[in-house]
């Protein structure tokens, strides 16, 4: 009631503010040197489309890219990129979505401190001083018609960059179709294929070539993937029949839920698999784990977890891993993995030694050490299976935890590593960023015939962090190739 009363008393002031907000925004935009934003990439139209979809939902004017372009060393394909003019009434909202901020008046936050959308989608973007790159305005945003896939007598090929590659891959695996992944780049008939490209051979399938073509075409519908038909296995680089192609097994995934498991993290994993990838997932309550036959599953995911209920299942989980299972542990679950001695991980610790902080400032000091949610840059090794399908050599990562894993002495065991100056957007204290520099958000540990995969950061945050969803998907399909 007090809020309504205050609004009534401020009625004229609020109405004036509402009336002038957009006109002031237009005036400010017209005077700015920044005239447009180009965003997108060269090989993943789906991710750029989903970002354009959000802009369109908020009635922000979006244009197509006039032609294939290279801007500041980054490639933008016409069919996978967009241009947003800044001289429009919602320019303030556009800036709120695309700007980065690393300096703040306060160090305490109610929620996360960074929302930068192009970083969360991991698309290239640039503020431009003209609208020269803009094509026609997109009045009705729609997914482009599927590209025709010619029937092949030898094999079908596609790169792994597309956002919906995991969905396509699982659909075919579920139909019993044999698929291989390329561990090294290669070229064939003038087309280059990156690490993690997929090959679907026509021979040795459980169906004839006509049915295989039909299944592939149906599975790819609406996913914005480029699939090519090849008639030969002779390539520049690795041959299609070489040992540098590994057969992918269909994952069977379980995720822990219940007491001790952070429900937000579990829900985000479930949402991603169910809504985006359409991969079935079994939710297992922590209290019921000892009654479950884990041999039914290839993967067990432990979202951020704290507590002691899992302790009674340690030997069961360890035995399952040793016989070929893959355990994926997120955030605080890493501490449980350490404590249970499933694996030994060196963690950096923060020594809280306050200097010059008075008693009445201690709460603010402690609060400032939290990482409520910020965006950080990493260098990645694109040849490692955890990074298959990621186009750039850097990857923005969302972090809202204070778990810092030491890098391995062997560089090839650090395929994702925080840079020397990692902060891209948001707040982090000097003490915490010193711990973050050079640490690693990912570790793969062999155990018997199985795998333990550790991730300090949430790759699926609030269903809009598209850029690192692929890291999670790669743990499902490529864990055995990380050994």
Regions found by a protein language model. Name each.
Residues 1-483:
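Intrinsic-disorder/low-complexity accessory segments
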């Amino acid at each position: 009631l007090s809020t309504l009363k205050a609004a009534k008393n401020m009625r004229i002031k609020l109405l004036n503010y509402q009336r002038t907000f957009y006109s002031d925004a237009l005036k400010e935009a017209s005077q700015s040197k920044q005239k447009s934003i180009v965003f997108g990439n060269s090989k993943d139209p789906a991710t750029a489309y989903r970002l354009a979809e959000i802009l369109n939902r908020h009635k922000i004017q979006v244009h197509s890219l006039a032609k294939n372009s290279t801007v500041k060393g980054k490639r933008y394909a016409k069919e996978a990129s967009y241009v947003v003019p800044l001289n429009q009434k919602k320019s303030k909202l556009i800036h709120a979505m695309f700007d980065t901020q690393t300096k703040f008046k306060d160090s305490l936050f109610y929620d996360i401190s960074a929302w930068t959308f192009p970083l969360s989608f991991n698309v290239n973007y640039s503020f431009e001083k003209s609208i020269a790159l803009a094509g026609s305005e997109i009045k009705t945003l729609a997914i482009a018609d599927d590209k025709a896939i010619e029937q092949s007598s030898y094999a079908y090929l596609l790169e792994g960059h597309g956002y919906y590659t995991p969905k396509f891959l699982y659909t075919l695996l579920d139909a019993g179709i044999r698929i291989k992944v390329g561990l090294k780049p290669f070229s064939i008939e003038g087309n280059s294929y990156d690490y993690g490209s997929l090959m679907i051979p026509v021979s040795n399938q459980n169906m004839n070539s006509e049915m295989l073509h039909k299944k592939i075409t149906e599975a790819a519908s609406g996913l914005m993937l480029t699939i090519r038909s090849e008639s030969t296995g002779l390539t520049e680089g690795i041959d299609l029949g070489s040992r540098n192609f590994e057969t992918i097994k269909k994952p069977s995934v379980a995720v822990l839920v219940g007491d001790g498991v952070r429900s937000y993290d579990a829900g985000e994993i479930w949402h991603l698999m169910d809504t985006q990838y359409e991969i079935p997932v079994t939710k297992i309550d922590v209290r019921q784990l000892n009654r479950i036959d884990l041999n039914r599953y290839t993967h067990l995911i432990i979202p951020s977890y704290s507590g002691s209920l899992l302790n009674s299942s340690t030997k069961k989980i360890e035995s399952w891993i040793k016989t070929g299972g893959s355990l994926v542990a997120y955030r605080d679950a890493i501490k449980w993995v350490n404590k249970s001695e499933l694996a030994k991980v060196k963690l950096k610790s923060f020594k809280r030694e306050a200097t010059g902080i008075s008693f009445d400032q201690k709460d603010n000091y402690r609060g400032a050490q939290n990482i409520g949610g910020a965006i950080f840059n990493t260098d990645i090794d694109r040849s490692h299976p955890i990074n298959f399908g990621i186009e750039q050599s850097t990857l923005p990562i969302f972090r809202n935890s204070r778990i810092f894993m030491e890098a391995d002495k062997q560089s090839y065991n650090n395929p994702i590593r925080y840079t020397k100056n990692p902060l891209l957007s948001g707040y982090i204290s000097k003490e915490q960023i010193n711990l973050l520099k050079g640490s690693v958000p990912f570790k793969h540990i062999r155990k018997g015939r199985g795998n333990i995969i550790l991730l300090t950061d949430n790759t699926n945050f609030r269903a809009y962090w598209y850029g690192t969803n692929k890291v999670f998907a790669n743990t499902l399909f490529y864990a055995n190739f990380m050994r």
